[in-house]
Design a protein with these regions (language model features):
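Cysteine-cluster motifs in flexible loop/terminal segments that predominantly coordinate metals
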Residues: 11, 58-129
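Cytochrome P450 core scaffold surrounding the K-helix E-X-X-R motif
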Residues: 13-18
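Mid-domain Rossmann-like dinucleotide-binding core that forms the NAD(H)/NADP(H) cofactor-binding site
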Residues: 53, 107-108, 118-207, 211, ...
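C-terminal hydrophobic helical "lid"/dimerization subdomain
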Residues: 207, 220, 237, 300-357
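Residues in the short beta-alpha loop(s) of Rossmann-like NAD(P)-binding domains
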Residues: 186-187, 265, 302
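Glycine-rich beta-strand-centered segment in the early N-terminal region that forms part
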Residues: 1-8, 21-69, 73-74, 102, ...
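Glycine-rich cofactor phosphate-binding loops and adjacent beta1-alpha1 units
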Residues: 149-151, 192-293
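Short, flexible surface segments
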Residues: 47-50, 153, 255
Length: 357
């Protein structure tokens, strides 16, 4: 199947590759958050038709392997490229070590197993693209973080990272009925966005985020925690610490609490600032984690496990993930957008590229 891309987002995961912190091949095409209109279909495609508006999950699944049949589309055994990692499971568009599949920051995207890998959108898709394009990755991923953490209505949650995924986790937690949603970051524009949806912003440049969480929870800690930063976490002085948010979460979450990790932790880093992380390793406070009886869930989001329900939340107005969009730009301005987004410049929260503009 060929999809004519009309909206494609820049993701924080793209920045790992943009900065040379992964083994992404030179000449590859970025872009795993894609929406567009079906332009051509192959003979084996029968449910999706030319002209349909679709959101394309960033996971590429087959629909019939053992993992896909269990709903684990992020870990497909058929589409995985085992030339680099022999026991690899999972594939994605324009993503390091996840197959030869080109991304959608282009005019057209080739989508294998088209019936399985496209989510048909409602009639209002064209005018509400900035809402529905979030179904390709970050809205399901933010939701997944709360699921991995085990969040239930009436519980408190602390989210480390107010980037797009962290803000989506906060949005998900609010929809799911969390009694308190705390979001840790230090960028004022992103903390303002967290506050705009009813979350409590915590500025870690003004003091220990752990202490601030404990103060807000009467010394007990949050019921649940979400890691939405990944291995390029930085302290307020600008130093990178791949283990920082993980260890802060162990301290911020209560005894017997749950932690969901969707921030990217790559298995290797060609240009690490911490030598230990060259092989994807961090110093983790396992002793305190064990002592507190906490649980951790990790891994890429199985987008198809959530995207239909989230589509319907958007369609009915219950969810409005486009609140994070700061810029809509033609595809030709992508280099400028990457420079600003990579620098975390003020006001550059989420960029939607428009190839047809």
């Amino acid at each position: 199947m060929l999809v004519r891309i009309t909206s494609t987002n820049i993701c924080g995961s793209d920045l790992h590759m943009y900065e040379g912190r992964t083994d992404f091949p030179r000449g590859g095409v970025f872009g795993h958050e894609n929406l567009g209109q079906v332009a051509e279909v192959g003979n084996a495609v029968d449910r999706v038709k030319v002209g349909d508006w679709v959101a394309v999950p960033f996971n590429i699944g087959c629909g019939f392997c053992k993992n896909c049949e269990r709903g684990l589309s992020a870990f497909c055994l058929t589409t995985a490229d085992r030339s680099v990692v022999p026991n690899m499971a999972g594939a994605a568009y324009g993503f390091a070590d996840m197959g030869p599949y080109r991304g959608g920051q282009a005019d057209l995207l080739r989508v294998p197993y088209g019936d399985y890998n496209c989510l048909k959108l409602p009639p209002d898709a064209e005018e509400r693209q900035n809402e529905y394009v979030m179904l390709a990755d970050i809205f399901p991923t933010g939701w997944h973080a709360t699921e991995l953490a085990g969040l239930r209505p009436g519980e408190s949650v602390v989210i480390y990272g107010a980037g797009p995924v962290g803000l989506m986790a906060a949005h998900a937690a609010m929809i799911k009925g969390a009694c308190m949603v705390m979001v840790v970051d230090r960028h004022p524009d992103r903390l303002r966005l967290a506050g705009s949806i009813g979350a409590l912003p915590i500025d870690d440049s003004k003091g220990s985020p752990v202490d601030q969480v404990l103060e807000l929870t009467n010394g007990i800690g949050a019921d649940r925690g979400c890691e939405c930063v990944g291995y390029q976490a930085h302290d307020p002085e600008g130093h990178e610490h791949p283990n920082m948010t993980m260890n802060n979460l162990v301290k911020s979450v209560k005894f017997t609490g749950g932690i969901g990790v969707v921030g990217v932790y790559a298995p290797q880093d060609p240009a690490p600032q911490d030598p230990l992380y060259k092989q994807g390793e961090i110093v983790f406070d396992h002793g305190l984690f064990w002592f507190k009886g906490q649980t951790i869930g990790t891994g890429q989001c199985n987008v198809k496990a959530y995207n239909r329900q989230l589509r319907d939340l958007i369609s009915t107005g219950r969810a409005k993930p486009s609140f994070i969009v700061s810029h809509e730009l033609p595809l030709g301005e992508a280099p400028k957008a990457y420079q600003h987004f990579d620098a975390r410049d003020e006001g550059w929260t989420k960029v939607v590229l428009k190839p047809a503009a």
